[in-house]
């Protein structure tokens, strides 16, 4: 069977620091849908880019990598309700119809609501995207101007058809209830995000904060081979400021291309803009001085962590280049 892979797609730069709140890896799930006869709705929440397998069929017809409904033979439209993996403010939507060429919806709209207890009875749905025309086999990026916090979304497709992937980009909203709980303060699901980086030729630093261990070498941050003096770096914001108790640096799958050393600098800043952080970061205090790396290994540090107050941002220095799969910063959320 011939398998076609989705063409490379570069997110608009403004979205590179945003989190996909509808990512199944952080707990996003389909609650209910009007119909998913041809392809299960949960597929459109998968992290992996869609594929097309030319000769793959199942009992319902052509297998498609996404959500696809049957052909509508009466008035109405199809819809799907999704519980976001984490609550947050929505900045943009990507309704991706890749490989849906003669079966994509004519148009789509999207609503959102805040229901922290997942009780949608009487939920007040707000329109996030008015009914908008869609095209075949392409990404549709829509910017959203709404400061509200949402937990659920409802995608409406008119009148029927298929969507390969739905991505809901935004900023994670963390409800702090326990300051004594130890969390990975850098994790994607806890609001960690990438701000800037020196290079991402083979793998984006946003992978560093993904859930779980890396599935392969592509699921990590990897830079090109350095042919000049210096080293590579990336700056990340913690989801919530806190005191760091344990650091993990995982080089899973990086065997001939792991860095020689890694160090971490840190700072606490309340109101700095992302643009201000980049030139300042080289002067931040060290949280972890340069440590030698091993291939395909989880490196754990506790006693090596230098004295510090609470931390809001870090700079990871990868010396001189190479690849890292994950970085974890375990600690407690600081009290205001």
Curated annotation (Swiss-Prot):
Superkingdom of this protein's organism: Bacteria
EC number: 3.5.3.4
Group of enzyme by EC: hydrolase
GO terms (BP aspect): allantoin catabolic process; purine nucleobase metabolic process
Pathway: Nitrogen metabolism; (S)-allantoin degradation; (S)-ureidoglycolate from allantoate (aminidohydrolase route): step 1/1
Catalysed reaction equations from the record: allantoate + H2O = (S)-ureidoglycolate + urea
One example GO MF annotation: allantoicase activity
Family (UniProt): Belongs to the allantoicase family.
Protein name: Probable allantoicase
Organism expressing this protein natively: Acinetobacter baumannii (strain SDF)
Organism placement in taxonomy: Bacteria, Pseudomonadati, Pseudomonadota, Gammaproteobacteria, Moraxellales
